[in-house]
Amino acid sequence: MTNRAAACVCGLPTASCSREPARVSLCHCLACQRRTGSTYGIAAFFPRESVVVAGDAKAYTRSSDSGYAVTFYFCPNCGSTVYWSPDRKPDLVAVAMGAFGDPAFSAPTQAVFTEHRHKWVRSGPAG
């Protein structure tokens, strides 16, 4: 059994994942660009029953580019996003790939909203 631990910069909220991710997705949507302050976001999606969250987290819900609501959980202390729950996929929890702090983590298997990809970013998976 795989155990992975994700945390924010200061370690307050955590997400422990007991299985391999169902998928790892690189998202170029404008909302992810704004949320991360980067040109894309990368999420590892895990079956909900395999994720245990702990510590204080502040929630923020917004409509996604797909039209479904998504609730983000971030640290009230350092502001880092650790995980989120997409209404479109209620059986999954998304965890920010960078929150694992593991350079050997699985590479993304798909790219979405590639029409918003910055031209200087290499295409990556399926895009």
Give the residues covered by each predicted segment.
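A short Gly-Trp-Pro
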Residues: 1-127
